[in-house]
Amino acid sequence: SDLIPNLFHKLSGQYYYFRDQSKKMFKKEIDNIFEDNDFSSMLNTFFAKRDLEQYAVYNSLAMIDSYFSRLEHILVLALPFSKNNKEYDIKKFIGEFWSKKYSEVFDLNNQDSKRIHDELNLIKEKYRNTFAHGGFEKKGQSFHFHLENYGVVPATMSDYKNSVHFNFTPLNESEFENICLFFDVVDNFFKENLEASWMFCNSGLDLIMDDESLSRLLKKAEDLEVFRNWLDSENERLSNYINAAY
């Protein structure tokens, strides 16, 4: 029978690792040691700060990437719960874009679902896709332009929020914090609106796709308390089996 491995904890671990690394890098202070306003030590401090900021950005982009991988994984594991015995093709679904997956699991006519989808899409287009497409934005352009006496300055010229952004890095600390806050909102939205699916993801149990296993799973999920106890006992049974095998 088809089995879909539950990688929720692995993908969560990856996401939180990059998130913690970014936070540390953004918060890390560089000692300002200016000996008699010595220009070279000022310059060294500037470059050290810039390097830290770059490392924070690398980790932030990896965090965003990891979050979307985890998001798609949750949607795959949630599909049988949201379809509940309706016809669907899980193999085809796995190959779909994240937004198609999202719209299969959530009703985009619902205002909250739509708002979260659109905000995720903005983050995806601005941060994830820019770097997935060789560092070029799909909407708008990535330009560098010359500034008198300063040389070439990176500028992100795009139609996001109809504004022009001038920056040395693709995202800063406050943007990083806002993205983290928003990802937490999305997680809470999932917990509330995909309760059984979220519990299943957290259980770490693999999704077994044969008719008998699936209908038993969905039957148990009709009552969340029953479902929670069942997941616990399945996990216990599995760990006893693994321990006995070794």
Listing of model-derived features with the role each one plays in the protein:
Residues 53-82:
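Short, hydrophobic, well-ordered secondary-structure elements
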Residues 116-151:
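Histidine-centered, metal-coordinating catalytic motifs and their short helical/loop contexts
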Residues 1-58:
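Charged alpha-helical initiation segments
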Residues 10, 14-17, 69, 119, ...:
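Charged, amphipathic alpha-helical oligomerization/scaffolding segments
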Residues 154-246:
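Polyanionic, low-complexity intrinsically disordered segments
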Residues 76-96, 137-147:
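Short acidic alpha-helical/loop segments enriched in Asp/Glu that coordinate divalent cations
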